[in-house]
From Swiss-Prot:
Its main location: cytoplasm. Residues 22-86 form the 4Fe-4S Wbl-type domain. Disruption phenotype: Not essential. Its cofactor is [4Fe-4S] cluster. GO terms for cellular component: cytoplasm. It comes from the Bacteria. One of its GO terms (biological process) is negative regulation of DNA-templated transcription. A redox-sensitive transcriptional regulator. Maintains intracellular redox homeostasis by regulating catabolic metabolism and polyketide biosynthesis. Regulates expression of the redox buffer ergothioneine (ERG). In concert with myothiol (MSH), another redox buffer, responds to low pH leading to acid resistance. The apo- but not holo-form probably binds DNA. It comes from Mycolicibacterium smegmatis (strain ATCC 700084 / mc(2)155). Keywords: 4Fe-4S, Cytoplasm, Disulfide bond, DNA-binding, Iron, Iron-sulfur, Metal-binding, Transcription, Transcription regulation. Induction: Constitutively expressed. Pfam families: Whib. This is Redox-responsive transcriptional regulator WhiB3. PROSITE patterns: 4FE4S_WBL. The lineage of its organism: Bacteria, Bacillati, Actinomycetota, Actinomycetes, Mycobacteriales.
């Protein structure tokens, strides 16, 4: 879970990119798995979420945010939890 000291301050400009995301207004269940979801159902949901991310104008900002604060759940910037974890283990904090 992100620690408060890792999160950006209350400056609205820092979060402005979220207003331009294609996911804005989309049900969060597309990006965050329900309890017990596995296998094919999870793979299909993640694939749909990543398809939206690929054409999103703020994918780089979203991905950078998720890596910088260690978002533990969901699809962020076209990356799943396990993909982000792998990048972080390799020492990559930001990737566009």
């Amino acid at each position: 879970m992100p620690q408060p000291q890792q999160l950006p301050g209350p400056n609205a400009d820092i979060w402005d990119w979220q207003m331009r995301g294609l996911c804005r207004g989309v049900d969060s269940s597309m990006f965050f798995h329900p309890d017990g979801e596995r296998g094919r159902a999870r793979a299909q949901r993640e694939m749909r979420a990543k398809e939206m991310c690929r054409s999103c104008p703020v994918i780089a900002q979203c991905r950078s945010h998720a890596l910088a604060v260690g978002e533990p759940y969901g699809i962020w910037g076209g990356l799943s939890e396990s993909e982000r974890e792998l990048l972080l283990k390799r020492g990559i904090r930001r990737s566009a």
